[in-house]
């Protein structure tokens, strides 16, 4: 009788050890255990690499000095603005007046067909700048077409940041920021030959943004 009990106890211990071994093999799937089949290692895919290409280097005095302003007085308004190379970038500053239905100011770079070559295939455009807490707008265009593409970006006062603007979120507009139904729905970065920065949306009062560069992320 005692021999039977000892045999049963030994059998139970063997079964329990086997169960623990199988459980261990299941848990440690990357370790070969006896005759158990080793699980395949899962390889996580890497995020695609990106490259930032500068399309307007406004940290260089010579390039910044080629930028000019256009404000609402062309439409009877009284807003004012100026540009200057200051603090290592293009300082675009002025005052927005709502008199005579005005309310916008802008600065733009020269026509440059090389912008499109640099920006071809871009997934986003970036504006690196020190803002003032107001919302600005990046406008890009192909000078051979009557439409442009725009996207707003809200700045953080006193902070230097790069504002990433996805290409697929640019909206086509006409000369007066009105709808442009004849324009392709999606911006083709390879067609860009001019960039501009606007402040509008009736943001009355003084403003200032210092732009270091505008880039394309490819």
Model regions: which residues?
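N-terminal secretory signal peptides that target proteins for export/translocation
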Residues: 1-14
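Beta-rich carbohydrate-recognition modules and glycan-binding surfaces
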Residues: 2, 34-218
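Intrinsically disordered, low-complexity terminal and linker regions enriched in polar/acidic
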Residues: 16-18
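Short beta-strand/loop turn elements enriched in aromatics
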Residues: 20-21, 88
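Bacterial N-terminal signal peptides
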Residues: 21-32
């Amino acid at each position: 009788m005692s021999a039977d009990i000892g045999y049963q106890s030994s059998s139970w211990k063997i079964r329990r050890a086997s169960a623990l071994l199988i459980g261990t093999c299941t848990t440690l799937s990357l370790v070969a255990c006896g005759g158990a089949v080793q699980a395949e290692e899962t390889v996580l895919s890497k995020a695609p690499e990106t490259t930032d290409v500068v399309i307007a280097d406004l940290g260089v005095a010579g390039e910044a000095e080629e930028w000019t302003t256009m404000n609402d007085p062309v439409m009877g308004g009284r807003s004012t603005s100026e540009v200057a190379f200051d603090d290592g970038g293009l300082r675009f500053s002025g005052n927005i007046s709502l008199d005579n239905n005005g309310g916008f100011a802008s600065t733009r770079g020269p026509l440059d067909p090389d912008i499109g070559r640099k920006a071809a295939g871009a997934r986003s455009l970036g504006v690196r700048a020190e803002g003032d807490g107001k919302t600005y707008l990046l406008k890009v265009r192909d000078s051979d077409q009557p439409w442009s593409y725009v996207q707003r970006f809200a700045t953080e006062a006193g902070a230097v940041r790069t504002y990433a603007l996805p290409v697929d979120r640019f909206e086509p507009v006409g000369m007066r920021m009105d709808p442009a139904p004849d324009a392709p729905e999606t911006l083709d970065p390879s067609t860009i030959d001019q960039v501009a920065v606007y402040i509008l949306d009736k943001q009355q009062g003084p403003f200032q943004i210092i732009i270091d560069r505008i880039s394309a992320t490819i």
